[in-house]
Structures are given as structure tokens and as C-alpha cells.
Amino acid sequence: MEQEPKTKALLAAFGCALGYLLAGKLLAALRPVPAAGDRLLSFLYHCAAAPVLEELVFRGAVLRMAGPLGERNAVLLQAVLFAVQHGSPAGMAWALVCGLVLGVLAQRTGRVWPGMLLHTLNNLLVFVAG
């Protein structure tokens, strides 16, 4: 039985986001995120690795996979999935807003690198403030 394109899109988007979340949990168990005391490693993780990987996964893969749902729905879905993997309710709320902005940016430009730069800037500001 052939699935509808929208069902395939939902399953693919959820699968991609779940895979990213599980891979992150596995890596954290094997090698925990650098402690706040190790500023250089923490900086590299939060301001270089995380923004690049998250943009590739959520604005690259998930947004593209969700495309058959329509532009608005695809942006909303990837933003919700992005927010859910950010933990606390406050973190999720801000991540939802960022995910919406970064999703629209990726759709308008057709590229993920502008979002990578904006995401890196956001994380850098949070890192410096924290």
C-alpha cells in the first residue's frame, strides 16, 4: 500500500528529528557536553558545532522532507521539532521563535548557511551573557 506524500513527509521529518535527538543523547552519554568550567570546549560546542549541525538537520533535512506539507506547514513543523529538542519550557519557547525565523530564512534564500551564521550569533550572545 502506497502512502500519501504528506504522510511520507511527516514520517521522514519526525524520523530525522528523532534520529538527531537520539544521536545527541548517545553522544552525550559517551562524551558529555563540556562543563561550563571548560570555556574553550564549551564555546566550540555551543557556538560552532551545535549551530552548524542543527541547521543542517532542521533547516536542511527536516524542512526539505516536510516540503510536501506546504511551505508554512513545513516551517512550522521543523520549528516545533527544533524547539522540542531544546529541553526546558523557556528554552523551547525561544527555540520555537528562532526555528520559525531560521526556517523562513532558509526557505527564502534556499540555503542553510545564512541560518548557520544567525544561529551562531544567537548562541554566541547567549554564551557571552551566560
Each language-model region and where it sits:
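Hydrophobic alpha-helical membrane-embedded or membrane-associated segments
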Residues: 12-20
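Membrane-helix interface linkers and caps
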Residues: 1-11, 29-32, 65, 69
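Transmembrane helix-loop-helix hairpins at the membrane interface
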Residues: 19-28, 37-130
